[in-house]
């Protein structure tokens, strides 16, 4: 299994599939899956390529999900090895996407391949959902595939996403949920004028200070057993023309909340509106909900994943919901149990991204054992 995983991972890394480009990665994967009897369905949306590949019928349906797109490399000269060389040095596979997530995607594919070879008449259905739009807007990728499947009344019971979940060593963390993410773009109105005549103007920076203080110190909740407390961060703030003699006419503020299951997006919107009204601010606001929080409590998939990780790594993993959003937020809308498990995330999105080849081999074994536990 290890040889096939590493060989496929290298093939994928050598294709510079900067999001939302796929650059032939899914074609490589689809040929392998077709050769072992998977039915292929291409779902292109906009500039994004998506693959839905299935084997078998009936319940339960377990999905292996991943993405072929990657983030840009930055200056290649800063890399120890060329970012698309997929070179192996001291059992470490180097290249953009090695850890996030072409390595674990290769492990998912080979695990599924090996499983259907051994169990061609397995119970239930195995599906692979692969997209080229996870790292960028994530609008035409998994979200659109899920919309299509729901419109066809298809069902997903379990989903394993190969995102790099581990922190210190392989097997320390399984992600069984994610916080919600919502962003606001707020424009606070003032009246532009000359700094020497403040009585003829209204400075939106000055009028917003009390609001900003309350916004950034407000305690949204205390979190719960599964999630840390909701947090808010201002990401961008702008006002003024750049001249020192002009009072700005408008202040622009962009802030993001990562929120837990104790509140929802409607509570967030209403709370902010109440704050703005309290300070008598004139404003325009636009909200963008990236994803609602989801949680897969201990059930068949979580338990099967824990067991497989313990069997292969000899470590007992911790269930965790920290970190950013993932495509799990879309799959969870179908009522599926969702877990994320993959290699270490220490180098993702960084110069000199790399992953242990031994860890990728173990990921493949873990994914294979999850299939065995749920479909045999």
UniProtKB/Swiss-Prot annotation:
Determine if Metal-binding is one of this entry's keywords: yes
Signal sequence, renumbered to the chain = none
Entries under SUPFAM superfamilies matching the protein: Bacterial exopeptidase dimerisation domain (SSF55031), Zn-dependent exopeptidases (SSF53187)
Enzymatic class:
hydrolase
Q: Which cofactor does it need?
A: Zn(2+); Co(2+)
Active site (record annotation): 69, 134
Pfam families in the record: M20_dimer, Peptidase_M20
Positions binding Zn(2+) 2 in this chain are 100, 135, 349
Which Gene3D superfamilies has this protein been placed in?
3.30.70.360, Zn peptidases
Instruction: Name the keywords, alphabetized.
Output: Amino-acid biosynthesis, Cobalt, Diaminopimelate biosynthesis, Hydrolase, Lysine biosynthesis, Metal-binding, Zinc
Cofactor detail note: Binds 2 Zn(2+) or Co(2+) ions per subunit.
GO MF terms on file? acetylornithine deacetylase activity; cobalt ion binding; succinyl-diaminopimelate desuccinylase activity; zinc ion binding
Per the record, the GO terms for biological process are:
diaminopimelate biosynthetic process; L-arginine biosynthetic process; lysine biosynthetic process via diaminopimelate
| Family classification | Belongs to the peptidase M20A family. DapE subfamily.
Which purpose does this protein serve, as stated in its record?
A: Catalyzes the hydrolysis of N-succinyl-L,L-diaminopimelic acid (SDAP), forming succinate and LL-2,6-diaminopimelate (DAP), an intermediate involved in the bacterial biosynthesis of lysine and meso-diaminopimelic acid, an essential component of bacterial cell walls.
Q: How does it assemble?
A: Homodimer.
Q: What is this protein called?
A: Succinyl-diaminopimelate desuccinylase
């Amino acid at each position: 299994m290890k040889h096939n995983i590493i060989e496929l991972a290298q093939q994928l890394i050598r294709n510079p599939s900067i999001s939302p480009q796929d650059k032939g990665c899914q074609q490589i994967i689809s040929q392998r899956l077709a050769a072992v009897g998977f039915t292929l369905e291409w779902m292109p949306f906009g500039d994004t390529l998506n693959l839905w590949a299935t084997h078998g019928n009936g319940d339960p349906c377990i999905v292996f999900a991943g993405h072929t797109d990657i983030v840009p490399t930055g200056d290649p000269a800063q890399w120890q090895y060329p970012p698309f060389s997929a070179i192996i040095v001291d059992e470490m596979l180097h290249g953009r996407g090695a850890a996030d997530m072409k390595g674990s995607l290769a492990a998912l594919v080979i695990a599924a391949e090996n499983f259907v070879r051994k169990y061609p008449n397995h119970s239930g259905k195995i599906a692979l959902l692969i997209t080229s739009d996870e790292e960028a807007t994530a609008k035409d990728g998994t979200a659109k595939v899920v919309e299509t499947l729901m419109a066809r009344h298809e069902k997903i019971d379990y989903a394993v996403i190969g995102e790099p979940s581990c922190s210190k060593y392989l097997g320390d963390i399984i992600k069984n949920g994610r916080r919600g993410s919502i962003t606001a773009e707020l424009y606070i109105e003032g009246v532009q004028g000359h700094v020497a005549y403040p009585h003829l103007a209204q400075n939106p920076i000055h009028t917003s200070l009390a609001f900003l203080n309350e916004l950034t110190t407000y305690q949204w909740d205390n979190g719960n057993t599964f999630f840390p407390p909701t947090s808010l961060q201002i990401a961008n703030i702008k006002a003024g023309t750049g001249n020192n003699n002009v009072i700005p006419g408008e202040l622009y503020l962009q802030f993001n909340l990562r929120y837990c299951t104790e509140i929802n997006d409607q509570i967030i919107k209403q709370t902010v509106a109440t704050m703005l009204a309290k300070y008598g601010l004139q404003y325009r606001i636009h909200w963008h909900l990236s994803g609602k929080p989801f949680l897969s409590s201990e059930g068949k998939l979580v338990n099967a994943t824990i067991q497989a990780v313990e069997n292969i790594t000899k470590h007992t993993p911790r269930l965790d919901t920290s970190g950013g959003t993932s495509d799990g937020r879309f799959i969870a809308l179908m009522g599926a149990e969702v877990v994320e498990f993959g290699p270490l995330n220490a180098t993702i999105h960084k110069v000199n991204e790399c992953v242990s080849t031994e860890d990728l081999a173990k990921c493949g074994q873990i994914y294979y054992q999850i299939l065995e536990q749920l479909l045999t």
